[in-house]
């Protein structure tokens, strides 16, 4: 059934339960956000100070900490207890991006970085040999290429040296923040070093992923990658982008350790800014996928990417994010997710040669059929809010919904079909259909 054959008015029946679910089970409260953010800031301040004390190379190249991920995009579901932080390393300010640094596209969504020319032109900064040479030597091979494995191993060493400056108890390190003790352990996860933090009473737990990155466009000269990497959208005022030491398996590239994943988190934040209810929608789809075993392994970034492509779709009326009803938007994007799974394709937004779903293998089929069943049942039960709730909530949350929603449903009378404001016709593209 094609999505645009559905009645726009019918999907408004989902508005009230969606608003209730958003408020009670998805949206993070301001108090929780402030509490966890304050704890994170205290941990980070103490930890970065020890990192700078522990390693001269880190102190020399240290840039700002770049907050990334769901928590700071405001699309996090549940407690704000997981944070992604880019630990930015800035290249020498005297280097010119066009003459001293050679960045080339390699495998889809990856680049190589060569700084041999910059090292040879060190006369631009008389103190270069003393100030920068040690770090450059640690991070590069004998041909001047940055090597992600060396860079990542170096950062792990910095983290370990910094932690060793704190008191320890067993396998945990103790960071004192404003009179409170935070117990910290570490683990490796992809390109990140994760700090697993707990309060002394074990009531608060926070995971902090520290990802070391090399930042570009942080000085007077600028460098953007050549096609097929997407050029910087006009809406994006920020020019900085990062190279991430993220390993890529089976890419056929001879020197894969020279490859770095490109990351454009600043631009993605610009693209999602002030786009109506789009962040609510991202949270809803993420909530749904997190509840079901078949879809749990779909990374949240892939969900975000689907929305970036929808914003880029010229066949859509982009006023939809403010004019359509909550129910219509939710079902449209759920069906769009199904279309991507059905085609087994979610292209990386910045380099469409890279299909993100390739990393998931056969799990995509299970996801596709699960989403298809959910769509069919919701479409057939628009008058029953419990069907929608069943697919968006955990068992305990659903039991709570059943107890509470019926007694307050009258409070949503202002959202009834007759009183709801007119909404634009649903115009999905031809891909958004369920077969």
From Swiss-Prot:
A molecular-function term among this protein's GO annotations: 2',3'-cyclic GMP-AMP synthase activity
Stretch forming the signal peptide: none
Reaction(s) catalysed (UniProt annotation): GTP + ATP = 2',3'-cGAMP + 2 diphosphate; GTP + ATP = pppGp(2'-5')A + diphosphate; pppGp(2'-5')A = 2',3'-cGAMP + diphosphate
Binding site for ATP: 70, 82-84, 286, 300-304
SMART domains listed in its UniProt record: Mab-21 (SM01265)
Superkingdom, taxonomy of origin: Eukaryota
Any Pfam family the entry gives: Mab-21_C
Residues that bind GTP: 209
GO biological process: innate immune response
Cofactor(s) this protein requires: Mg(2+); Mn(2+)
Residues that coordinate or bind Mg(2+): 82, 84, 209
EC top class named in words: transferase
Keyword list, A-Z: ATP-binding, GTP-binding, Immunity, Innate immunity, Magnesium, Manganese, Metal-binding, Nucleotide-binding, Nucleotidyltransferase, Transferase, Zinc
Residues at which Mn(2+) binds: 311-312, 317
UniProt-listed Enzyme Commission number(s): 2.7.7.86
Family: Belongs to the mab-21 family.
Function: Nucleotidyltransferase that catalyzes the formation of cyclic GMP-AMP (2',3'-cGAMP) from ATP and GTP and plays a key role in innate immunity. Directly binds some unknown ligand, activating the nucleotidyltransferase activity, leading to synthesis of 2',3'-cGAMP, a second messenger that binds to and activates Sting, thereby triggering the immune response via activation of the NF-kappa-B transcription factor.
Protein name: Cyclic GMP-AMP synthase-like receptor
Gene for this chain: cGLR
